[in-house]
């Protein structure tokens, strides 16, 4: 069988991989096999960490809300605050509550005092 050189197609594929791996360090940015493996690994990590990022932010928001609610003893804890919010049908998500807790603590105290009544 004759040898197929695949010049243009192979070069285009390798160029695409090299462009992706241009910011990698060492051989991972220069050698095609190493760059291909590193590219697959990078994509796996990116996919995994997109899910982890959602969990991390939710955890951060909960920590911030809990810190502010315990600070002045407005509500006893985060869980009671959230329970009372749902009971009163106030649809504020954790991201918004965390922003309020950081930027305007008085507003969060007003909200929680209204809920307790």
Curated annotation (Swiss-Prot):
Protein family according to the UniProt entry: Belongs to the bacterial ribosomal protein bL20 family.
CC terms in the record's Gene Ontology section: chloroplast; ribonucleoprotein complex; ribosome
Matches recorded under InterPro entries: Ribosomal_bL20, RIBOSOMAL_L20_CS, Ribosomal_protein_bL20_C
Example of a GO MF term: structural constituent of ribosome
Subcellular locations according to the entry: Plastid, Chloroplast
Pfam families according to UniProt: Ribosomal_L20
PANTHER family found in the cross-reference section: 39S RIBOSOMAL PROTEIN L20
Gene designation per UniProt: rpl20
General function of this protein: Binds directly to 23S ribosomal RNA and is necessary for the in vitro assembly process of the 50S ribosomal subunit. It is not involved in the protein synthesizing functions of that subunit.
Organism: Acorus calamus
Name of this chain's protein: Large ribosomal subunit protein bL20c
Gene Ontology biological-process annotations: ribosomal large subunit assembly; translation
UniProtKB keywords: Chloroplast, Plastid, Ribonucleoprotein, Ribosomal protein, RNA-binding, rRNA-binding
């Amino acid at each position: 069988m004759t040898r197929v050189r695949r010049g243009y197609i192979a070069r285009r594929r390798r160029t695409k991989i090299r462009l992706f791996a241009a910011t990698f360090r060492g051989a991972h940015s220069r050698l095609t096999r190493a760059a291909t493996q590193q590219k697959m690994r990078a994509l796996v990590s990116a996919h995994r960490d997109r899910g982890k990022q959602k969990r991390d932010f939710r955890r951060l928001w909960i920590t911030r809300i809990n810190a502010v609610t315990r600070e002045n003893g407005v509500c006893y804890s985060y869980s009671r605050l959230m329970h009372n919010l749902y009971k009163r049908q106030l649809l504020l998500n954790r991201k918004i509550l965390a922003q309020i807790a950081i930027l305007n603590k008085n507003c969060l105290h007003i909200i929680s005092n209204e809920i307790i009544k």
